[in-house]
Design a protein with these regions (language model features):
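Short beta-strand edge/turn micro-motifs at domain boundaries
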Residues: 38-39, 128-129, 143, 147-195, ...
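Bacterial N-terminal signal peptides that target proteins for export
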Residues: 5-23
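Bacterial N-terminal signal peptides
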Residues: 22-32
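Short, low-complexity N-terminal intrinsically disordered segments enriched in polar/charged residues
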Residues: 37-67, 184-199
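Alpha-helical segment of the N-proximal tetratricopeptide repeat
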Residues: 196-215
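Intrinsically disordered, low-complexity segments enriched in Gly and acidic/Ser/Thr residues
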Residues: 236-324
Length: 353
């Protein structure tokens, strides 16, 4: 059992805090509609000089991240994002130790021509769409990038191999005065509890076939998290994964799980527990991933009272859906009361009764 109080505004949960900070630091969301920008060139269709320049720039950025060279990375970032670098500095500091000793391999590069994008009447940058056909096939990789200023862009995926756990470092780049500079940074692990995204996808399919809808739904979440390089990327394969997940989704969460649509679970004592979020987490690095459950708490209590409530909530969750006991290490309960710091407690499955 592990307990901690979360710092409000720093990390909403262990699972998505790093990702959110990185994107918030480097991409500004816009409310305008998406602008069509069809000019996408995949690496197989690029001129060798263009491919080499983009790959070299991405490898250089990845090397700076690996070395924890925040100053160097800031110097290689477009001006409008370099001036407010606190978020990305935090992400680099959290990520760099996990990359030590790894080999950097440029996996994919794309050229995205956003030179025809138009700013809104208020000067805001539009959302942009790029549709990339892969190797003259029916498969596509699509980019829907929010708040993208007009310009010439590239997207690069650099894998870090040979570490205890492999990582993916994805970069959005923009050409400034003939040089590629960073305009977005998206680090994600390539494995969780020792398994990659394809493994979780296959396991989710098997769970769905066994009518283990809750397990399948959560494992599909883990698969997507490991396979998607950045939140604004969609692909033919990811669409297939999402379609499979939708067909396996339990009816109780067909509209998702949120503050407006909580999952209500009744405990053995008749008490109701309202979960406002349900996902997965691998922060402990165990042999199985954990469930991450956000619990609405009306009245905040002291640590002992919150721990007791969280234990009861975890028991109610596994009591309602006992299939979850098999493929998960444990359950994180993040107790959240309005105006208070979240309080997170992890219970191994063997502790939950």
């Amino acid at each position: 059992m592990r307990t901690r109080t979360e710092r409000r505004g720093k990390m909403g949960t262990m699972m998505d805090g790093m990702k959110r900070l990185g994107m918030a630091a480097l991409l500004m969301l816009a409310v305008s509609g998406p602008a069509r920008a069809d000019d996408c060139i995949t690496q197989s269709a690029m001129k060798p000089a263009d491919r080499d320049a983009l790959a070299t720039a991405a490898r250089g950025l990845a090397a700076k991240v690996q070395a924890g060279d925040v100053a160097g990375l800031r110097g290689a970032t477009v001006a409008e994002y370099a001036k407010d670098f606190g978020g990305i500095e935090y992400v680099v500091g959290s990520t760099a130790p996990k990359l030590k000793g790894g080999t950097l391999v440029v996996e994919q590069v794309y050229l995205l021509d956003g030179s025809q994008l138009k700013r809104g009447a208020d000067g805001s940058a539009p959302d942009a769409q790029f549709f990339c056909t892969l190797n003259h096939s029916m498969a596509e990789a699509d980019f829907l990038i929010p708040g993208l200023a007009p310009g010439s862009y590239g997207f690069a995926i650099v894998n870090v191999e040979g570490t205890a756990s492999p990582w993916r470092l994805s970069f959005l780049l923009r050409k400034e005065q003939g040089q590629w500079q960073m305009a977005g940074f998206y680090p994600t692990p390539l494995s969780a509890a020792g398994h990659d995204g394809i493994w979780y996808w296959k396991e989710a399919r098997a769970m769905a076939a066994r009518k283990e809808q809750w397990n399948a739904w959560l494992y599909y979440q883990q698969a997507e998290s490991l396979l998607r390089p950045a939140n604004f990327i969609q692909s033919t394969h990811l669409e297939k994964l999402k379609a499979e997940q939708a067909s396996a989704t339990p009816p109780a969460v067909s509209d998702g799980v949120s503050k407006d649509a909580p999952l209500v679970v009744k405990g053995a004592d008749g008490a109701e527990y309202r979960f406002t979020g349900l996902g997965v987490d691998d922060s402990l690095g165990k042999d199985k991933i954990d469930i991450m459950a956000h619990l609405k708490v009306d009245q905040p209590g002291d640590a002992a009272a919150t721990h007791k409530l969280s234990a009861s909530a975890a028991g109610a969750l596994l009591g309602a859906y006992p299939e979850m006991r098999r493929p998960f290490h444990g359950v994180w309960i993040v107790a959240e009361a309005a105006g208070q710091n979240p309080f997170a407690t992890e219970f191994s499955v063997s502790e939950i009764h």
